[in-house]
């Protein structure tokens, strides 16, 4: 079984170092002349799947599907399946975090044997990094990945993430714990990544980190694609910029969406060349 870290590296090499977001916000649906219903959600996702089929990674924002209940989850299941059928890696942006049996259930849902299972999922470590163990174990057993929140772009996050813990920031502690988990898993590209926002007030030190780094917040949210190189001292090849609204606002036309994605992919292509 090929681990997620290697599959991600191969996908980036073939299709470029970019993660495109599917964020079906009600305002976007209305802007695309779609109803804010499960049917409108399905139409939105169908357009995105067609436009994004040639990109490396696509990240559906799970919260926008949850708001439509069972029908929304049905759309998400279909979207994940269609993207994976197109050889796109799917990163479910679910930000799950819990303990014990509940964390195990989330693990089965998102990176185990489940219709919702994606290639990777985002997770919150703020119940203690050890609480993620069931998720990390299930992901590893199925060749899937986990991206752990470390330093986010929202201003509220700094109060926790920049707080001192054992002489380092909490965000740095998370990075170091993820790094240790990757090293324990053996050689090769790490399958556990961290999330560091493009506009995070203070990026942790990533110079010794060997896993992938998801970098959301590029584009409309203020992150500049040309300024990502060297983030936290990470190797440029580790970075995976994530873009949603900057591209989605080009819709609803499939050619226009695809072209917007290609422009952003071109803007971050230098990350793969280093």
Swiss-Prot record:
Chemical reaction(s) catalysed: orotidine 5'-phosphate + H(+) = UMP + CO2
Top-rank taxon: Bacteria
Enzyme class (EC, first level): lyase
SUPFAM superfamilies named among the record's database cross-references: Ribulose-phoshate binding barrel
A GO molecular-function descriptor: orotidine-5'-phosphate decarboxylase activity
Active site: residue positions: 95
Keywords: Decarboxylase, Lyase, Pyrimidine biosynthesis
Lyase found in the keyword field: yes
UniProt protein name: Orotidine 5'-phosphate decarboxylase
Gene: pyrF
Pathway(s) per entry: Pyrimidine metabolism; UMP biosynthesis via de novo pathway; UMP from orotate: step 2/2
């Amino acid at each position: 079984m090929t681990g997620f870290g290697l599959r991600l590296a191969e996908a980036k090499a073939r299709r470029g170092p970019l993660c495109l977001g599917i964020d079906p916000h009600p305002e976007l649906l209305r802007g695309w002349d779609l109803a804010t219903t499960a049917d409108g959600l399905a139409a939105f996702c169908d357009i995105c799947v067609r436009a994004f089929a040639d990109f490396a990674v696509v990240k559906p924002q799970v919260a926008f599907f949850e708001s439509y209940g069972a029908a929304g989850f049905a759309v998400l299941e279909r979207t994940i399946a269609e993207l994976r059928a197109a050889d796109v890696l799917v990163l479910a942006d679910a930000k799950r975090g819990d303990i014990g049996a509940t964390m195990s259930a989330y693990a089965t849902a998102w990176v185990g044997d489940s219709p919702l299972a994606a290639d990777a999922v985002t997770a919150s470590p703020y119940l203690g990094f050890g609480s993620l163990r069931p998720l990390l174990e299930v992901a590893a057993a199925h060749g899937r990945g986990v991206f752990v929140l470390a330093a986010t772009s929202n201003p509220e996050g700094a109060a926790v993430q920049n707080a001192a813990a054992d002489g380092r920031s909490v965000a740095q502690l998370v990075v170091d714990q993820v790094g240790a988990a990757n090293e324990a898993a053996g050689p090769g590209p790490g399958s556990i990544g961290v999330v560091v926002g493009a506009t995070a007030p203070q990026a942790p030190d990533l110079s010794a980190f060997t896993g992938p780094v998801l970098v959301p917040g590029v584009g409309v949210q203020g992150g500049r694609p040309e300024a990502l190189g060297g983030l936290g001292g990470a190797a440029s090849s580790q970075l995976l910029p994530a873009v949603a609204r900057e591209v989605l606002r080009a819709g609803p036309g499939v050619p226009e969406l695809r072209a917007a994605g290609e422009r952003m992919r071109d803007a971050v292509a230098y990350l793969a060349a280093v």
